């Protein structure tokens, strides 16, 4: 039986601008008894049809739009079309950069709310993050098996956001083989080991690809400090850029061991490379007390803010760590600093970094504004898709 949602008067404006979310406070009434994931018809208060979406009774985002086309039904062909378009739109990038690891589907920005898919060689790794995507899991799997018959499909839906949708975390094989060993991918001629089963996110930070490449132009004959190094991506590019020394710092010994393997996999000389297991904040303070200086510092911390309530604390954390970095930079040194918190707006992040430089007593210049790689597109009607912000800053 069809379910009909009628919005509060005036709340249709965001949908007319093709934003894919309907919040609980924007709904005046529901006709029918939807279960989580059900496809629902969305109407303006005056009875105009607006969109077709997926119901989520547990979430503040009560419905996510599948389509704004009244003639388009949500079936296997729908998912085949969306996924095929997502692949074709990325094919030029894949060919240009020689990629065997890339984001195939970027959820709302690719018209598939709550569905993230990363491709690692012969594995497709899915994160199913919404009630709608969960409800359509079998159709999504069928579409992927049709389009990628040679690929195994693995799920990494072990993320806290599923709880907001009334879903439990889940991982495991959906189809094909289990990735028992790390998978080797390539980007820009660099080989990288990816632990699909146990690594961060779906195994690797594909969104930082362009920014990893950007670091290499600043590292020739330089001393480089790579903070929150994970499996060493920025450090590898720094070495390929001619760095005379690279210090990788992370709390995970497993990640550091893989960082070493990644450097060796690329045939790099690591005689002047360190892999240090330490808390970054504490180590930077220790370096400051010792008077250590670096020519290039990379700050790629984990997400500091998961909610608006955490944003103030996140601002303090970002300011503190960037101030420490400025204090460790040699004259003319370059800081590459990032925030992956979607709630952190570009202007706010830029202000935090500027304040950090001021508190460190350093004059600084922004050389580059950086963001996520282009296989992580940002829908023009979905600004929430712009989550990764980066700055390249030179300190005098």
UniProtKB/Swiss-Prot annotation:
SUPFAM superfamilies to which the protein is assigned, alphabetical: PUA domain-like, S-adenosyl-L-methionine-dependent methyltransferases
One GO CC annotation? cytoplasm
**Record keywords: Ribosomal protein included?**
no
One GO molecular function term of this record is: RNA binding
Matching entries from InterPro entries are given as:
PUA, PUA-like_sf, PUA_sf, RLMI, RlmI-like_PUA, SAM-dep_methyl-trfase, SAM-dependent_MTases_sf
Q: Where is the PUA domain?
A: 2-79
Q: By its UniProt entry, which PROSITE patterns does this protein fall under?
A: PUA
Q: What is its main location?
A: cytoplasm
Q: Which keywords appear in this protein's UniProt record, sorted alphabetically?
A: Cytoplasm, Methyltransferase, RNA-binding, rRNA processing, S-adenosyl-L-methionine, Transferase
The broad enzyme category this protein falls into is transferase
What this protein catalyses is:
cytidine(1962) in 23S rRNA + S-adenosyl-L-methionine = 5-methylcytidine(1962) in 23S rRNA + S-adenosyl-L-homocysteine + H(+)
Q: Which Pfam families match?
A: Methyltrans_SAM (PF10672), PUA_3 (PF17785)
Supply the EC number(s).
2.1.1.191
From the Swiss-Prot or TrEMBL record, state where the protein is found. Cytoplasm
| Similarity remark | Belongs to the methyltransferase superfamily. RlmI family.
General function of this protein:
Specifically methylates the cytosine at position 1962 (m5C1962) of 23S rRNA.
User: What name does this protein carry?
Assistant: Ribosomal RNA large subunit methyltransferase I
> What is the scientific name of the source organism?
Aeromonas salmonicida (strain A449)
Tell me the lineage of the source organism: Bacteria, Pseudomonadati, Pseudomonadota, Gammaproteobacteria, Aeromonadales
**Its gene?**
rlmI
């Amino acid at each position: 039986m069809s379910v009909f949602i009628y919005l509060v008067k005036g709340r249709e404006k965001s949908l007319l601008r093709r934003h894919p979310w309907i919040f609980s406070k924007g709904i005046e009434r529901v006709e029918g008894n939807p279960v989580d994931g059900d496809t629902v018809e969305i109407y303006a208060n005056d009875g105009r049809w607006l969109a077709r979406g997926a119901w989520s009774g547990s979430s503040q985002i009560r419905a996510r739009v599948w389509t704004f086309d009244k003639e388009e039904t949500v079936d296997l062909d729908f998912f085949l079309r969306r996924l095929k378009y997502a692949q074709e739109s990325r094919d030029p990038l894949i060919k240009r950069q020689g990629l065997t690891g890339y984001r195939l589907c970027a959820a709302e920005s690719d018209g598939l709310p709550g569905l993230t898919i990363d491709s690692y060689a012969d594995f497709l790794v899915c994160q199913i993050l919404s009630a709608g995507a969960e409800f359509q899991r079998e159709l999504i799997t069928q579409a992927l098996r049709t389009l990628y018959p040679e690929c195994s499909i693995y799920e990494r839906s072990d993320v806290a956001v599923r709880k907001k949708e009334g879903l439990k975390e889940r991982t495991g094989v959906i189809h094909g083989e289990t990735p028992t060993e790390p998978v080797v991918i390539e980007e820009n001629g660099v080989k990288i080991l990816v632990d699909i089963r146990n690594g961060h996110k779906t195994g690797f930070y594909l969104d930082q690809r362009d920014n990893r490449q950007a670091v290499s132009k600043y590292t020739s004959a330089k001393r480089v400090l790579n903070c929150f190094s994970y499996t060493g991506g920025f450090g590898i590019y720094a070495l390929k850029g001619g760095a005379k020394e690279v210090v990788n710092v992370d709390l995970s010994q497993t990640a550091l061991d893989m960082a070493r393997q990644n450097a060796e996999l690329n045939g790099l000389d690591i005689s002047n490379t360190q892999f240090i297991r330490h808390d970054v904040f504490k180590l930077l303070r220790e370096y400051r007390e010792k008077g250590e200086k670096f020519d290039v510092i990379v700050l790629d911390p984990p997400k500091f803010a998961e909610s608006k309530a955490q944003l103030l604390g996140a601002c303090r954390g970002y300011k503190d760590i960037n101030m420490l970095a400025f204090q460790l930079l040699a004259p003319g040194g370059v800081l590459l600093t990032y925030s992956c918190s979607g709630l952190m707006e570009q202007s706010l992040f830029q202000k935090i970094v500027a304040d950090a430089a001021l508190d460190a007593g350093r004059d600084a210049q922004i050389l580059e504004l950086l963001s996520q790689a282009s296989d992580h597109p940002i829908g023009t009607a979905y600004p929430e898709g712009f989550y990764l912000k980066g700055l390249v800053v030179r300190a005098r």
